[in-house]
Each structure stands twice: as structure tokens, then as C-alpha cells.
């Protein structure tokens, strides 16, 4: 899918791939040239892209519900868009079939919506996911989405 996002100066852009790579780019250093691109293997693709700030956390979810949590300040900024990025899924786990199905940058109060293979949606507090280490689902996890805390406040008013 093609996503368009607006961002502010000094934010970081993160790309997360199916095979567990995390590529961080500094917004201020991005080129407008059309030849710049991310290099992936033939079997890999981007499952999530988002902007992140220093006060946010990064959540990554595998198809089996394992949650990987990182502070956004641990995001290494790549020197170029053609860099491979950080490896979050070790090669031994890749051989076992572990893959990322979704990722997001979250703040306190945000909610995470999880879609599983049975078609059910589950809404969880982002903070509870970081401590739990996994999500209980009725089937394999297909995707996740974020409901920002500030949008919940607007709806309530």
C-alpha cells in the first residue's frame, strides 16, 4: 500500500520490513531525488512506515503475537536510504519463520488495534503491550493499527 504522511523537521522516519529490519532516516537529510530508494531482498517488503519522536516507543509485532519494544531514541539513523538498517529478528528466528506483521510508534495512552486471522479485532493499551511481551489472539496476527490518545480525547469532547 502507498501511504502519504506529513512530518515536522527534526523528526525521524522509520521503515520496518517483513524480515525484521528497522531503517531510520532523519527527515532533514532526505533527498527529493527519485532515484533514492530502500534496498530489500526479493522476499522482503515494508510492513510499516511512520515518523517518530524522542518521547515515543517503537512496537513491533510478529505473526505469532510476540511484541518487541524499543525506545525511539535507540533508532539508529542510517547514513543513506540504501542502508540495510538494524536487524531486529535474528537469522535463527527467520529460519524458523518468524516475521513482522506490523509496527508503530506509540505514546502513553495510545491504543493498538490488532487484526487476527479469524477476522477479529482486539483493542489493547499500548503501555500494556510493552510489558507483556506478547499478544493473545485467536489466530495468527495479520496487522496492527494505532488509535492515538489525542484522537480519543477529541471524540470524547
How would you describe each model-predicted region?
Residues 1-157:
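Short, structured "edge-of-domain" segments at secondary-structure transitions
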